[in-house]
């Protein structure tokens, strides 16, 4: 069990009872090994401790014999050494492995132990106590010894015969690092150096001690070989303090070596027999112990030749080791004679008895090691041992032993238990060899260690079985009940014990997930269960047969119950909390697996919860008691339900028998009986009421199908097959009998079965419970059987039909067995056999079949699911039933009615109805369409009724019906007829319930609803004295045309399998007859939305279509009728359509004959009637039911706060913030979002620049310097509001200011803005300087005091006046220019306060409250736009603070781009009351540049985004945006980069990442809406961009497939790149194609592609267009040479021929940018072609490109070799004046059909393409 660094529990799954190497493997749920990740190495290494000679007690190594592991898992799940918890460290544990293990070794961290087995190495996690890694041995010899590297915790060394293996347990695929043969004889021991992880010492029977340097494991270097010259060596150990000293044991000699010398330092005989073990002291450098076959352990202090002390034992010693902690402790195991582990104290002089004996192993102990936990104040140690009894045991040291050996520790106190005093009583325990016991949890003392496991300390105890403390030496474990007084309270331990026993044969634990702490149990009990059956389970509780019993429970059931019987299943999921058993588990029923009703499940759950609560109050385990109680409750439920079912069946049978002759008149009795049974239609199941105590009843036995064991196919014996065939023959024969005989047989069978007193021996009755045989491929399913299969079929099995719920059963190919004879319609539905036909019963593609349970839920017939972008998908599956037409007698009666008069038609019609009632039992189920809700048989009305919404209970119902009879038997317009029809339908629908189970649905789909037929034919007496044409609705041509448009797939809406896909109106599925719901208005509220959905689905189905013979149009439902319940079936057959047409014609003709009483039309009526009868006969097979599938996609965007119209119209940049807020506010008002109107007005006010100004120049200074003047109505912000709010809101009307506006006005007043006094006067004339001269003349004439006498004087006077006016005009213009200049200067000198307004209560706090509000509403659209606008406002303020010039947006002529100079800032002079003022500055002209466009970003190769002031961040999203006159792309000037100061922004800088998240989510929403430009605009506001990551190319070794960082594989010692031509590894310059990955030596590849274009490997890749070969410098030299050749050719052509004058001028204009063509007649035209062609951009060629290959924009290398053949062709093409050669790479480009130029155009192209490095360059060159 493991805890991670956060103390989270990581629990393993349960292990099997016995772990074997061939069958046991770690479940897949535990394959979360850190060794499979790159961080595994860090986990391992972090657990290790650095060795130090000053701290030798931290080292614990192992030695011993070999062994084999058992687990096939390749992953390791292990714990952190720093978190060795108390789950396994403070207790004794026992783990069973059914393998032979010779040696074990514990890693330094104390978390893993390696078992050296016969064929593999097995790594066991000591916290999980299970195998987590199994490494197969690479040798035919078994593993001799293993040792764990103390420096590198991932390295393990093992020996096999003469070879040494080095393993890396972190590597899941290739764990073997190296293998080398180190000796001539078998290796007896090996030891890693404690100071250098690369040094390994091995010893062998060849008497040599070899020391290896493993820096390169495959080429291990033996740098030292020590020769003993004596017999073979047994063990070797390194000194714990000196890295140069090691000791080895040779027979009876001990040798100590110094590797710096060639000879040994000590060579002496230490024992009289063979030395088997040596170990260096952890405290003294010179101290070493030896153990021998002479039954002694000697302690030496070399170089003294005498032992320091000697321990004498009674048995030969196999191994002896010092305790890693404390002082003086020595642990020994015996070679033979005893099976105990003894602990000795070397500090005392009494060595006669050990201080502790660990008893538990039942066979010789072969190896042991220490598990150490060492810290500053808490140290602990545990002994890990392995014995021949195949048990791995963990032994803890008691506290008194720790005190004895001076081990510092913290006493362990179990939680939830009182602290007890530690005793020193020595207690030993032993266990018998129990084959069923896999892991035993033992204790060695009498204290509270055993019983202290609780929910807090042992959340992850492994799969253990407990042995109870006892002072006795013998302890047998038999069937253990979970005794709460002496059992550890651990979930895993409890589950293990429960799995090892059989609580009940009907109970099974299906799934255990200890990581999630869940357990799924299933209880399956047959319905014929008897209490006597429990006696058969008494012999199943023997622990010696646990493994076989649990696996053979189903097999026992097969032997005991060979008949296929119905059963009751309950499946529960137990979820155990972390504090279990202090808190009780959570119980959850799995609905689809439970066959019990909901009421029973709730009762079971409440009972189990009470039991769990009682146990948890006492902190006791409750799981086992819950399982026992669960089985009892299910059994009690079956026993309680059995008498109820029996009595119901008997009652139903009697009622049916009594009412057989009067079934038509007493339909209510049958309906009441149907309500008492779940199966209210034909094909119901009969409950099993067999008594096992009776031997008189013979039942045809069927093979029991194991529902849970679906791994194999169950074969049926020949005898059983014969019985099944006889059963099928009997069933088919009996089904064709009369109804009376069937009833008598049913009653007799039920009576004999239930009473069973007369000893009557009965065979299988045709109406007995249906018995299902095993499905076999290739065999046709018999009648009356519904097979449900539960496993995938084999590949060679035949294809089976679809599921019954998806199969359209309206056109059954065979008649129902109960339809003939007329009596089956009167039978009760619960005891009649199913009439499901052979062809329509579908078998799913599974293998093992089992019976459909009674309580399987019905599939969902309707529902709705939300889709993306504000869509709701609503679907409905409607069951439509074919209601039978009238038979021939009714047709004849109708014919007689047609010949009679109107007065006699009533009597005839009544008699016709009576005849229908009389012959209803013999009528066939054919003809018209109706639903399960009911319908009129006499009129064959198309009545559609949804199963789950019965809307037929209205008191008044207008029912439009279509007359299908020969008479005018349509619905009358009178209220009486309508109410009678409505009442009949209501009576019928009350007896029909929606299907609640899957079986009921199958019965509805497969059988004919005879009950509806009888009800309607017995009660509907419709008057037909009125005219038929008056009852029918007039045809609607518009509706008809629209219907035809919606069905383009067929001219007629009636198809055999119609399917409509109306993408325009989002309707899919089977077509309905009307689509009036398509144009329905969208909902505007959730309440209207619910009504809208119901209207949509009802309108799509509740429609009527009739065929008018005169107009040839479809008659649709009346527009004025709101309650219309009739509808058409989407599955008319052709015969049904003809029948409708004929009956319609017949009805019309009958109506005319009835009115006119003409005899000439009677013959036509008779002919029509005959045709009608024939059509009815042809349509005998048209009965059945079908599913009308309708799906509607509804737009519910109006219900969501996200608005696509606002998203498409919002402005987020390109204008001043005030204008943006005003514009967005108007958009929100149009969308009726009043909250957004207030929001945008508020944002416009709080982002006003005046709120940030620290102070302004007072009004007197402004007047004295600039002489401002203006009219009282002139304002700078477009309004005359005293608070300046009207300008921001864009309204000049007088209104009461809001609270926010009042607060803002107060804030502005407090910011030293002041008000303009009313005494301010104008310093210049208000006469406009732009008045024309004639206006000035007339004005001056009025100012003349008197006119002179002469005309000449008047002219001079006027001229002087005009001159004065001109001078005044010039002065005024000069003053205006000065005013504008001073205003600009004043703006630049204005000081903006950084931390003033944002920290105000109406600043960031208000913004935060707005964001929190819309965050609760989850309106990501508003959140994103708010964050964008506030950043834009901060950017504008930043420009004002920096004094930058503000430019306009868009073109200079735009109306919205007026500069600041064109909008003079003026003050209002006041006047009137109050002294109003206008804002000092007009900030409406402040604007910024729009985001960067795509073209400019490509040219600059990088774009800058909005970011904090003073920072630049490169764009990761290359999206531009252009939008009319609002937005403009970036220029190349650096000032175009938009920056802002976070101190000026109203957004909290600490939440910038959250705001980026809002923008990112909103951008994703815009992407789904298709608003890509808007998305790009929002993405530019994102501040935290992802760092651009380049393309990383990985190279894999051609031999081991490892991914390499360079071109050399250290594992294989080869170069990874292999040449595709010479097949030799490439060491130098290489070139390869990035599309196919093939390449090689550059020279080889270049030589290949001089003549070839395809890849040399034959992969088909055109590498010649993807593979560079030479450097760019060489390629540029080639281009220069070609350019010089072209210039020489042009000069030669100029001397030979004179050029036209206009050509010479054009030549000078194009010099330096283009080249001339070699062909003289086309030089001028070609030059023009070059001027346009030279700027063409080319994309790199890829193998997926089917066009001509083109040159990429960037090539690092190219080919310098030319093809001579291509060169000649090129010269011929250019008439001998070509470029002199064609590059093999560019040949197709130069001579492509779309290019008529030579390489001169190509030079210009390549010159432009090499100006920058394109990021999408797919070429790579390596050296």
Swiss-Prot record:
Compositionally biased residues, Polar residues: 749-768, 827-840, 1710-1725
A single MF term (Gene Ontology): signaling adaptor activity
WD repeats: 138-177, 182-222, 228-267, 270-310, 312-354, 360-405, 1207-1250
Keyword Repeat included in the entry's annotation: yes
Keyword annotations: Repeat, WD repeat
Segments for region (Disordered): 1-68, 418-461, 530-562, 649-687, 714-778, 805-840, 883-940, 966-996, 1014-1058, 1122-1186, 1264-1307, 1697-1725, 1764-1823
Protein name: WD repeat-containing protein DDB_G0292056
Pfam families in alphabetical order: WD40, zf-RING_16
SMART domains xrefs: WD40 (SM00320)
A GO cellular-component term linked to this record: Seh1-associated complex
UniProt-listed GO biological process terms: cellular response to amino acid starvation; positive regulation of TORC1 signaling
Signal sequence extent: none
Organism: Dictyostelium discoideum (Social amoeba)
Top-rank taxon, per record: Eukaryota
Biased composition (Low complexity): 16-61, 419-432, 440-461, 654-680, 717-748, 885-926, 966-993, 1014-1041, 1127-1183, 1282-1293
InterPro entries in alphabetical order: WD40/YVTN_repeat-like_dom_sf, WD40_repeat_CS, WD40_repeat_dom_sf, WD40_rpt, WDR59-like, WDR59_mRING-H2-C3H3C2, WDR59_RTC1-like_RING_Znf
């Amino acid at each position: 069990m493991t805890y991670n660094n956060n103390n989270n529990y990581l629990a393993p799954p349960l292990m099997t009872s016995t772990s074997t190497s061939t069958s046991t493997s770690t479940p897949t749920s535990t394959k979360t090994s850190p060794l499979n990740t790159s961080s595994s190495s860090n986990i391992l290494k972090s657990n290790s401790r650095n060795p130090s000679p000053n701290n030798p007690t931290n080292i614990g190594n192992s030695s011993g014999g070999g062994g084999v592991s058992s687990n096939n898992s390749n992953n390791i799940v292990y714990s952190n050494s720093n978190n060795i918890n108390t789950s396994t460290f403070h207790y004794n544990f026992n783990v069973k492995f059914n393998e032979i293990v010779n040696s074990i070794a514990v890693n330094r961290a104390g978390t893993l132990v390696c078992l050296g087995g016969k064929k593999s190495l097995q790594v066991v996690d000591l916290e999980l106590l299970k195998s987590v890694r199994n490494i197969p041995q690479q040798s035919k010899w078994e593993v001799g010894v293993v040792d764990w590297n103390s420096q590198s915790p991932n390295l393990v060394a093992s020996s096999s015969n003469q070879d040494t293996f080095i393993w890396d347990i972190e590597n899941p695929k290739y764990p073997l690092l190296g293998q080398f043969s180190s000796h001539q004889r078998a290796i007896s021991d090996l030891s890693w150096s404690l100071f250098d992880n690369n040094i390994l010492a091995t010893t062998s029977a060849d008497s040599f001690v070899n020391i290896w340097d493993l820096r390169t494991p495959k080429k291990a270097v033996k740098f030292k070989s020590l020769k003993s010259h004596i017999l073979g060596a047994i063990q070797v150990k390194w000194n714990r303090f000196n890295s140069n000293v090691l000791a080895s044991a040779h027979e009876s000699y001990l040798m100590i070596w110094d590797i710096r010398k060639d000879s040994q330092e000590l060579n002496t005989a230490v024992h009289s027999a063979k030395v088997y073990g040596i170990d260096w002291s952890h405290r003294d450098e010179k101290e070493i112990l030896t153990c021998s076959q002479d039954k002694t352990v000697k302690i030496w202090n070399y170089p003294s030749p005498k032992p320091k002390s000697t321990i004498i034992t009674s048995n030969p010693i196999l191994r002896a080791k010092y305790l890693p902690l404390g002082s003086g402790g020595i642990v020994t195991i015996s070679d033979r004679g005893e099976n105990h582990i003894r602990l000795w104290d070397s500090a005392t002089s009494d060595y006669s008895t050990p201080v502790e004996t660990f008893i538990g192993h039942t066979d010789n102990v072969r190896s042991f090691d220490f598990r150490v936990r060492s810290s500053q104040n808490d140290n602990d140690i545990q002994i890990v041992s392995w014995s021949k009894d195949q048990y791995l045991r963990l032994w803890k040291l008691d506290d008194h032993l720790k005190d004895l050996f001076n081990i510092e520790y913290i006493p362990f106190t179990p939680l939830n238990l009182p602290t007890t005093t530690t005793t020193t009583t020595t207690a030993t325990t032993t266990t018998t060899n129990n084959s069923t016991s896999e892991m035993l949890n033992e204790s060695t003392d009498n204290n509270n260690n055993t019983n202290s496991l609780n929910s807090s300390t042992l959340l992850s105890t492994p799969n253990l079985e407990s042995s109870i403390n006892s002072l006795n030496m013998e302890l047998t474990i038999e069937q253990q009940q979970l005794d709460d007084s002496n059992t550890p309270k651990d979930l895993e331990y409890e589950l293990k014990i429960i799995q090892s026993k059989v609580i009940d044969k009907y109970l099974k634990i299906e799934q255990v997930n200890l990581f999630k702490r869940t357990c799924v149990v299933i209880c399956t009990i047959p319905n014929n269960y008897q209490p006597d059956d429990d006696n058969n389970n008494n012999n199943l509780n023997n622990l010696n047969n646990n493994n076989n019993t649990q696996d053979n429970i189903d097999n026992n059931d097969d032997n005991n119950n060979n008949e296929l019987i119905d059963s009751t299943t309950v499946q529960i999921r137990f979820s155990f909390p972390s504090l279990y058993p202090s808190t009780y588990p959570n119980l959850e029923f799995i609905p689809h697996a439970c066959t019990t009703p909901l009421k029973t499940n709730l009762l079971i759950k409440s009972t189990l919860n009470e039991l769990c609560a009682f146990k948890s109050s006492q902190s006791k385990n409750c799981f086992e008691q819950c399982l026992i109680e669960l089985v009892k409750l299910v059994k009690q439920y079956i026993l309680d339900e059995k008498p109820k079912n029996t009595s119901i069946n008997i009652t139903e049978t009697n009622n049916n028998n009594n009412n057989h002759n009067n079934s038509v008149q007493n339909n209510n009795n049958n309906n009441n009986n149907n309500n008492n049974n779940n199966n209210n239609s034909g094909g119901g199941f009969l409950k099993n009421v067999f008594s096992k105590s009776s031997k008189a009843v013979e039942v045809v036995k069927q093979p029991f199908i194991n529902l849970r064991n679906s791994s194999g196919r169950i074969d049926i014996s020949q005898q059983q097959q014969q019985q099944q065939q006889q059963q099928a023959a009997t069933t088919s024969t009996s089904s064709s009998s009369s109804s009376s005989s069937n009833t008598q047989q049913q009653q007799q069978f039920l009576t004999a079965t239930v009473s069973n007193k007369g000893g009557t021996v009965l065979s299988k009755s045709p109406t007995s419970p249906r018995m299902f045989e095993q499905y076999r491929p290739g065999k046709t399913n018999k009648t009356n059987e519904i097979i449900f299969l539960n496993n995938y079929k084999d590949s060679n099995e035949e294809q089976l039909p679809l599921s019954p719920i998806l199969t359209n059963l309206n056109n059954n190919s065979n008649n129902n067995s109960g339809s003939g004879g007329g009596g089956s319609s009167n039978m009760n539905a619960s005891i009649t056999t199913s009439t499901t036909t052979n062809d329509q019963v579908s078998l799913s593609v599974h293998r093992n079949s089992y019976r459909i349970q009674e309580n399987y839920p019905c599939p969902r017939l309707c529902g709705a699911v939300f889709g993306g972008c504000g869509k709701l998908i609503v679907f409905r599956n409607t069951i439509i039933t074919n209601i039978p037409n009238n038979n021939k007698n009714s047709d004849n009666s109708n014919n007689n009615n047609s010949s009679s008069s109107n007065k006699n038609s009533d009597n005839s019609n009544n008699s016709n109805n009576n005849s229908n009632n009389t012959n209803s039992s013999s009528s066939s189920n054919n003809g018209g369409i109706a639903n399960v809700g009911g319908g009129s048989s006499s009129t064959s009305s198309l009545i559609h009724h949804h199963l789950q919404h019965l809307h037929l209970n209205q008191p008044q119902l207008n029912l439009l019906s279509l007359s299908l009879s020969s008479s005018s038997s349509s619905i009358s317009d009178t209220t009486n007829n309508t109410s009678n029809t409505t009442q009949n339908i209501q009576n019928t629908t009350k007896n029909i319930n929606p299907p609640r189970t899957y079986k009921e649905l199958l019965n509805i789909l497969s059988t004919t609803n005879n009950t509806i037929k009888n009800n309607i034919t017995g009660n509907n007496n419709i008057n037909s004295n009125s005219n038929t044409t008056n009852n029918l609705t007039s045809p609607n041509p518009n509706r008809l045309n629209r219907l035809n448009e919606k069905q383009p797939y067929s001219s007629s809406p009636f198809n055999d399998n119609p399917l409509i896909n109306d993408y325009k109106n989002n309707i899919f599925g089977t077509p309905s007859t009307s689509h009036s719901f398509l144009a329905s208005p969208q909902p505007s509220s959730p309440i209207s939305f619910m009504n809208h959905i119901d209207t949509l689905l009802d309108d799509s189905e509740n429609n009527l279509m009739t065929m008018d013979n005169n107009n040839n149009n479809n008659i649709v439902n009346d527009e004025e009728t709101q309650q219309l319940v009739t509808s058409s079936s989407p599955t008319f057959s052709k015969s049904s359509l003809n029948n409708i047409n004929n009956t319609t014609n017949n009805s019309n003709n009958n109506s005319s004959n009835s009115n006119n009483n003409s005899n000439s039309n009677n013959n036509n009526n008779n002919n029509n009637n005959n045709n009608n009868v024939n059509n009815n006969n042809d349509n005998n097979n048209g009965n059945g039911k079908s599913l009308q599938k309708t799906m509607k996609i509804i737009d519910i965007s109006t219900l969501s706060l996200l608005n696509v119209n606002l998203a498409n119209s919002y402005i987020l940049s390109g204008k001043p913030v005030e204008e943006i807020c005003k514009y967005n506010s108007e958009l929100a008002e149009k969308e009726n979002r009043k909250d957004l109107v207030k929001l945008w007005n508020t944002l416009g006010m709080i982002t006003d620049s005046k709120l940030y100004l620290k102070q302004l120049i007072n009004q007197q200074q402004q007047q004295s310097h600039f002489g401002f003047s203006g009219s009282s109505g002139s304002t700078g912000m477009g309004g005359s509001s005293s608070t300046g709010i009207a300008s921001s809101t864009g309204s000049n009307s007088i209104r009461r200011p809001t609270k926010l506006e009042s607060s803002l006005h107060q804030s502005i007043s407090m910011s030293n803005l002041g008000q303009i006094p009313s005494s301010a006067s104008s310093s210049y004339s208000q006469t406009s300087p732009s008045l024309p001269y004639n206006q000035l003349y007339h004005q001056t004439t009025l100012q003349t005091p008197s006119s002179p006498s002469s005309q000449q004087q008047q002219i001079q006077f006027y001229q002087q006046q005009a001159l004065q006016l001109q001078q005044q005009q010039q002065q005024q213009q000069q003053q205006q220019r000065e005013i504008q200049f001073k205003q600009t200067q004043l703006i630049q000198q204005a000081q903006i306060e950084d931390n003033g307004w944002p920290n105000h209560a109406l600043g960031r706090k208000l913004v935060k409250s707005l964001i929190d509000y819309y965050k609760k509403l989850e309106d990501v659209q508003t959140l994103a736009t708010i964050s964008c606008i506030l950043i834009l406002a901060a950017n504008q303020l930043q420009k004002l603070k920096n004094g930058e010039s503000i430019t306009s947006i868009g073109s200079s002529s735009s109306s919205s781009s007026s500069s600041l100079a064109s909008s003079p800032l003026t003050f209002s002079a006041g006047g009137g009351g109050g002294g109003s003022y206008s804002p000092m500055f007009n900030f409406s002209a402040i604007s910024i540049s729009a985001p960067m466009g795509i073209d400019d970003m490509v040219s600059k190769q990088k774009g800058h985004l909005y970011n904090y002031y003073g920072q630049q961040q490169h764009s990761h999203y290359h999206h531009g945006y252009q939008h009319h006159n609002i937005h403009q792309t970036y220029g190349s000037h650096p000032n175009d980069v938009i920056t802002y100061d976070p101190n000026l922004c109203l957004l909290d800088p600490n939440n910038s990442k959250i705001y980026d998240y809002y923008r990112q989510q909103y951008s994703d929403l815009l992407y789904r809406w298709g608003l890509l430009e808007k998305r790009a605009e929002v993405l530019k506001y994102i501040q935290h961009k992802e760092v651009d990551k380049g393309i990383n190319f990985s190279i894999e070794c051609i031999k081991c497939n490892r991914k390499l960082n360079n071109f050399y594989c250290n594992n294989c010692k080869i170069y990874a790149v292999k040449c595709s031509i010479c097949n030799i590894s490439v060491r130098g310059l290489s070139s390869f194609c990035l599309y196919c990955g093939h390449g090689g030596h550059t020279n080889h590849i270049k030589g290949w592609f001089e003549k070839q274009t395809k890849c040399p490997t034959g992969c088909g890749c055109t590498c010649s267009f993807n593979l560079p070969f030479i450097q760019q410098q060489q390629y540029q030299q080639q281009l220069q040479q070609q350019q010089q050749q072209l210039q020489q050719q042009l000069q030669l052509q100029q001397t030979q021929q004179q050029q036209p004058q206009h050509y010479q001028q054009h030549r000078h204009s194009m010099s330096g940018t283009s080249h001339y063509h070699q062909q003289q007649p086309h030089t001028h035209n070609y030059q023009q072609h070059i001027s346009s062609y030279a700027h063409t951009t080319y994309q790199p060629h890829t193998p997926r490109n089917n066009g001509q290959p083109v040159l990429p924009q960037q090539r690092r290398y190219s080919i310098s070799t030319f093809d001579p053949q291509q060169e000649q062709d090129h010269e011929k093409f250019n008439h001998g004046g070509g470029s002199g050669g064609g590059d093999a790479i560019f040949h197709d480009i130069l001579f492509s059909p779309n290019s008529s130029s030579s390489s001169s155009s190509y030079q210009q192209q390549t010159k432009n393409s090499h100006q920058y490095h394109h990021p999408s360059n797919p070429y790579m060159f390596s050296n």
